[in-house]
Amino acid sequence: LPYINNNYDFAEMASEMLGELNVSHTGCRFGGTGSTLATASLGVFFDDTYEGDGLKIKEIMKGSPLETSKKEIEPGYIIKAIDGQEIKAGQDYYPLLDGKAGRYTRLTISKKGKEFDITIKPISQGTENGLLYKRWIERNRQIVDKLSNNRIAYVHIKAMDAASFQTLYKELMSDENRNKEAVI
């Protein structure tokens, strides 16, 4: 192995070795040595058509910091500033969230022209990915319920592991799904 001198090459070699086992769902990858400063997330979707200063909220994900804040925040409100730094029209706001996951952060919100501040703890990108996954599942479930007149259940298995199988079984056997005619 004299030519394996970095983590990427080692991961490639390990993946090839694992491939020789002829089993599924195996592999090795290298995570990289990028910046340790992670950009936090607010767990919201913004209105891309809004052209004014700030960020106009289009949708707030269930379980996000804005959904669980003490002040009721709704779609249509505008985030004018993050920790006192104003957000101008078209400005890249991500640098304002660098390193803020899990740290108290002040947002200035505008509701019909009236401004107020709230303090939240932004979430990591990984946590937001979990919220996006749950949102995707719920949207799929709603589509299946609507198109089947609630006759077909929708479940999704997140991964090939014991916890995911337990969740799948729990959902299949729930009062909501147990007596449905079919499962997707």
Where in this protein do the model-derived segments appear?
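Conserved catalytic motifs of ABC-family nucleotide-binding domains
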Residues: 76
